[in-house]
Amino acid sequence: MKAPIPHLILLYATFTQSLKVVTKRGSADGCTDWSIDIKKYQVLVGEPVRIKCALFYGYIRTNYSLAQSAGLSLMWYKSSGPGDFEEPIAFDGSRMSKEEDSIWFRPTLLQDSGLYACVIRNSTYCMKVSISLTVGENDTGLCYNSKMKYFEKAELSKSKEISCRDIEDFLLPTREPEILWYKECRTKTWRPSIVFKRDTLLIREVREDDIGNYTCELKYGGFVVRRTTELTVTAPLTDKPPKLLYPMESKLTIQETQLGDSANLTCRAFFGYSGDVSPLIYWMKGEKFIEDLDENRVWESDIRILKEHLGEQEVSISLIVDSVEEGDLGNYSCYVENGNGRRHASVLLHKRELMYTVELAGGLGAILLLLVCLVTIYKCYKIEIMLFYRNHFGAEELDGDNKDYDAYLSYTKVDPDQWNQETGEEERFALEILPDMLEKHYGYKLFIPDRDLIPTGTYIEDVARCVDQSKRLIIVMTPNYVVRRGWSIFELETRLRNMLVTGEIKVILIECSELRGIMNYQEVEALKHTIKLLTVIKWHGPKCNKLNSKFWKRLQYEMPFKRIEPITHEQALDVSEQGPFGELQTVSAISMAAATSTALATAHPDLRSTFHNTYHSQMRQKHYYRSYEYDVPPTGTLPLTSIGNQHTYCNIPMTLINGQRPQTKSSREQNPDEAHTNSAILPLLPRETSISSVIW
């Protein structure tokens, strides 16, 4: 049924009236061109989409039905881009179809991207607008295209709704849509404060971990429609002005400089979240902005964002004076402001007087630091430094030039077959390792009582004389030494006690193990307090036997300085011939040899050979005994005389006592009386007949 002619005229008038309301943007061939519409369609490949002619949704006050009734026709054209050739669209009716004022794609393909122009016209009027369609693919491994996302912001601890955008064309009014939500393309167990309402996701209390990409998925026929929204969480909108961090508002900051130098004034401030408003921070000198100053040497840097979190920012701006002149000195103010207010703080650029306080303090600080470093090095490596100095620049001690021995070694003698597992290492160290190292490696001359002492009177007086002839007294505190009270000899003899108390001799006490709990240990502590010049050195077991250990360095440091010189063969033989008992040692050794030779002279030949080999092998195994060998002339006789039960006497030529060997004469030249003319009767003490003390 056709409409009455008056009605058509009225409709046409109304339509043309509406066309005149909108301002024209362009005109070509009498057709008004509104260029490209602000609404852009973005879909993923394979999704359906409906493109509506925008003329009926904002450009004219009518709809498609009225326009069609007024005799206007709707035409669609496609072009690749603005200004390109437009060609009419041939609709196939299946994948791409024209339905009233829209074009439907079911589904879209990549080649569907472009500009779609809808034109309504008749013989008198023409109007045109273009709509953009972009078809894209998902990013690799994701369910969305990062260039086709929607963006939303939410304030911390407040509520936020995220809508599934542009799905109105796929919803049925009589049916609730079935929409699935994903976060970062993964299904998620949502917390109770997140609820779903039709096509929206409601977060009742936004948290910082709600930041992310939310994707809604809707099924439409045999197709899937997805929309992705990126949610950004910010701090709550601030209602306070910015806060100045430096310089402070409450006081005037003074910055000193010298004329001709470069000056840099930095202002830092904190800005709360103010939406999309950029922070405003700037410098002024008096009432002038820096840009208004005539000097090009004074300028502002760009605003730098130092920190940013949830929209809150810490920013800074610098005022630079390239070469300070007298006119540049003065008061500069830093201003910060936002929609809630303004704050400012001042810096006084002041000329610095020539003072050397800082330089002097720096120099003194450097010297103090150097002294601290040197003291620390000296504390840690004192012994090594002193040993190095003594070895290269030191001189031997002069106080002990009249003394024959470097040290008197006091220890407890325990035979090796009596060593047990617990004290074996200590005894081996005291009897073997310690003397060997001091004599053979460091070249010290030790007085070892068990080896060097030849009693001439009372035993205690002999020990006192030997200690007096030594520069140091070394006491080796082994468990056996403590149990047997080996130091008692130094307390009994008055001369020895006075030497310890007055500091006449320096004592080196070597503790070989943990002595606490051992019987008589309290007396050891009392002895330490009695000795005036005492050094205690700990021996911590076999690890201290290494040559480079701290133990030997400390011991060498406490011993008298002695340059290590190569020991010749003759010196090695005569190492113990000096001192107050040198001659007696020689005589003792010779007398022992003589006694042994005489005893063997009357023995069976096989017994003599066996005893000779056994004796010398045992004497060489124990280094702390020194053997003296003398070849008795075959024809010589050494008569032995026994007086009582106390001593054994031996007739020895005086030439042997003086350390000389007789020159052998022929039997015709030799005087029969010479063999006994220069002879002497010397006693063989009980010690020379294998009886010796235990503690020395």
UniProtKB/Swiss-Prot annotation:
May regulate secretion and presynaptic differentiation through inhibition of the activity of N-type voltage-gated calcium channel. May activate the MAP kinase JNK. Plays a role in neurite outgrowth. During dendritic spine formation can bidirectionally induce pre- and post-synaptic differentiation of neurons by trans-synaptically binding to PTPRD. Its main location: membrane. Residues 659-680 are annotated as: Disordered. It is linked to Intellectual developmental disorder, X-linked 21: A disorder characterized by significantly below average general intellectual functioning associated with impairments in adaptive behavior and manifested during the developmental period. Intellectual deficiency is the only primary symptom of non-syndromic X-linked forms, while syndromic intellectual disability presents with associated physical, neurological and/or psychiatric manifestations. It comes from Homo sapiens (Human). Residues 549-644 are annotated as: Interaction with NCS1. Detected at low levels in heart, skeletal muscle, ovary, skin, amygdala, caudate nucleus, corpus callosum, hippocampus, substantia nigra and thalamus. Detected at very low levels in tonsil, prostate, testis, small intestine, placenta, colon and fetal liver. Residues 1-18 form the signal peptide. The gene is IL1RAPL1. Belongs to the interleukin-1 receptor family. Residues 666-676 have a biased composition (Basic and acidic residues). GO terms for cellular component: axon; cell surface; cytoplasm; dendrite; glutamatergic synapse; plasma membrane; postsynaptic membrane. Pfam families: ig (PF00047), Ig_6 (PF18452), TIR (PF01582). Keywords: Cell membrane, Cell projection, Cytoplasm, Disulfide bond, Glycoprotein, Hydrolase, Immunoglobulin domain, Intellectual disability, Membrane, NAD, Receptor, Repeat, Signal, Transmembrane, Transmembrane helix. It is a single-pass type I membrane protein. Residues 19-357 are extracellular. This is Interleukin-1 receptor accessory protein-like 1. Residues 379-696 are cytoplasmic.
